[in-house]
């Protein structure tokens, strides 16, 4: 068990810095953090950001894009439009209950975040176009 899992199990939450680029444009490495809490697989839904453990032990933070049953979930990083992974419910360690983005605390109740989530989940082809436009701005 690593420090993140230990904190979630013992304290009931963990605040973790973002690493990697798979959750751009929402979450940026070196700038943002995610607040995680234990989750009940029965309450997980499309759009939730979850921390799961891959078979090799790597921890990954991605968004649920499909829930067909309560046994498996399809997850994908916000900065991706292909290579979605099918995750067993037992691999899911925690769910994001909030984010520290540019120093501000954001939750499911934050209006702009709800809009972002709807847009981001609506269509993977649309996501590809948005990511292409955002990469041109750099």
What kind of feature is each model-predicted range?
Residues 1-138:
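Extended hydrophobic leader/signal-anchor segments used for secretion and membrane insertion
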């Amino acid at each position: 068990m690593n420090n993140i899992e230990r904190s979630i199990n013992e304290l009931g939450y963990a605040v973790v810095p973002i690493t990697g680029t798979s959750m751009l444009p929402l979450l940026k490495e070196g700038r943002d953090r995610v607040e995680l809490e234990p989750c009940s697989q029965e309450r997980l839904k499309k759009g939730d950001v979850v921390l799961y453990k891959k078979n090799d032990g790597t921890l990954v933070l991605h968004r649920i894009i499909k829930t067909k049953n309560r046994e498996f979930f399809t997850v994908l990083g916000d900065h991706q439009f292909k290579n979605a992974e099918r995750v067993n419910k037992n691999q899911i360690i925690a769910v994001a209950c909030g984010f520290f983005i540019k120093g501000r605390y954001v939750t499911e109740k934050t209006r702009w975040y709800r809009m972002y989530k709807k847009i981001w989940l609506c269509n993977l082809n649309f996501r590809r176009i948005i990511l292409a436009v955002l990469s041109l701005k750099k």
